[in-house]
Amino acid sequence: MFCKLFYENLIIIPALNKRKTLLNIDEVRKNIILKEGLYYFDYTASGLAYKPIEDEILKFLKTYANTHSDSSSSAVLTQKCYENARAELKSLLGLDDSFYLIATGQGATAAIKKFQEIMGIYISPATRALIGEANLRKLNLPLAIIGPYEHHSVEVSLREGLCDIKRIELDENNEIDYVMLENTLKQNAKRNIIASFSAASNVTGVKTDYKKIYSLIKKYNGILALDVATLSAYENVDCRYFDALFLSPHKLLGGVGSCGLLAIKKELCKNLPTFAAGGTVKYVSRTSHVFTNKVENLEEGGTPPIIQLIRANLAYKLRNEIGLNKIKEAECELGEMFCKELEKIDEVINYCPENLDRLPIFAFNVKGISPYDFAASLSSEFGIQTRAGCDCAGPYGHDLLNLKDNAIFEAKPGWVRVSIHYMHTKEDIKYLINAIKSCIKKHKKR
């Protein structure tokens, strides 16, 4: 199922759409940067570059300078552009004044690490060895509760962090087992609970009822973080129903090369940086130092990701100027079309549940053919870019493929993932379906 500035006469963060009306998808499509002959169906891994955004970045670079200085006009302008981008992003994402927005690293993984640093969960292997496992076991560790669809960046990092971890499994309907979740919360009611759930699977596109999860987590005074790396390319989440958000703007159209983003409730942050560096201090003498009281700057030590944040802002602005409703409508139509045609192919094993609200992301295998060989054939013979593997969601993959933990495999298990995007056309979908059928026939003859 699909869908149940002007500053001193200079434009700081310009609107991509001067007419103040929703952009036409056909016109947007013409400005995607993609080599002729390639068909891109890998948007869940990364978006593509967009020429008007690259043009705006080139304009901005004419007065570029590092931040953290009030003595030169270029530095002042760059600082204003940077902070303006942050402010606009908060608005584009629907964040209210109870949140900080921190730019970090290259994607959601960096946001996850920053969140764990702020919450005291992240610990380096060297620090762990220095403290010793025996001493660590004496600590009153928090319980981290995760969902069944989590990316390795969430699950593996928590396994290695200063916390105990509990994975909520799938129920008989292939969605989150809410009974198991509430029982886990009841059994650990006196503990410090930090929950992290993916808002949408990057494998099957299945959406999470994050409002329901939030209500359960808050019933037991827990904290809820949402991984929206997959979802936020298409829609926002209501800021009343989470405490932290992990975002990956590079997955948006035009977001290539942008930074990761962490939205986090102000009440969760301290007045000390997780890493003390240049840009986090107001004054440093030979014997002492004073940190800035601006928390967002505290967590962006050193040169901040200036171009990356501005690019992220432009990508989200493009998303909103296309229109979230228009995006949803296009993806519903194209997703339904692909799903119906895929189901007609007898050799295809489709792992995406039919009864759940989800994004048009498909994971499938072809009987008797390696997903890696199949994806390579689509690419080499038809120019179709998909992705084969487990999509950094191994535990969920074990559920989908009915695999036993720690089993020995002749080849790495996986599937072919296809991401249907609102920039695709019906002709693109037909081309993809015909290519899948053709590849199946060719492999059968071998």
Explain the meaning of each model-derived region.
Residues 6, 12-446:
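Pyridoxal 5′-phosphate
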